[in-house]
Regions:
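Local sequence-structure signature of Cys/Sec-based thiol-disulfide redox active-site neighborhoods
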Residues: 1-26
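Short active-site oxyanion
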Residues: 4-6, 29-31, 60-62
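Structured beta->alpha junctions
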Residues: 11, 34-37, 60
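Generic recognition of short, well-ordered alpha-helical segments
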Residues: 17-18, 43, 69
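Surface-exposed charge patches
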Residues: 21, 25, 43, 54
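Thiol-based oxidoreductase modules, predominantly thioredoxin-like and allied folds used
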Residues: 28-41, 51-52
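Thiol/disulfide oxidoreductase modules built on the thioredoxin-like
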Residues: 44-53, 64-65
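Non-catalytic, surface beta->alpha helical segment in thiol-disulfide oxidoreductase systems
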Residues: 58-82
Length: 82
C-alpha cells in the first residue's frame, strides 16, 4: 500500500510553491497541509522534528525544501512499493 504524500506548506513560502508545482507537473497526487494557518498541521510538522517548510512526507521518507533530485528519488521509490 502506497501512502499519499503530505506536503506541509506556509502561505508566502516560495519554496512551498515550487514543490507544489513540481508535484502537480509530474501528476503526483498529494495532500497539502498549511502549517501557518492550521494548528493541527503545525503540530504534525513539529512532530517531524522541524518547523520549516516545505516538507514533503511519504511514509517514513521526507524531503525538506525544493530539491528536485531528492523529490524524484522519494516519489519514485514510493510508487514502486507493492
Amino acid at each position: 500500500m502506497v501512502t499519499e504524500p503530505i506536503l506541509y506548506t506556509q502561505a508566502g513560502c516560495a519554496e512551498s510553491a515550487k514543490v507544489r508545482a513540481w508535484l502537480t507537473d509530474y501528476g503526483i497526487a498529494f495532500t497539502e497541509r498549511d502549517a501557518g494557518r492550521d494548528p493541527e498541521a503545525a503540530q504534525e510538522l513539529a512532530e517531524t522534528g522541524t518547523f520549516a517548510t516545505p516538507l514533503l512526507v511519504i511514509g517514513h521518507g521526507k524531503v525538506l525544501g525544493f530539491h528536485p533530485k531528492a523529490l524524484t528519488d522519494l516519489t519514485s521509490s514510493k510508487q514502486q512499493e507493492p
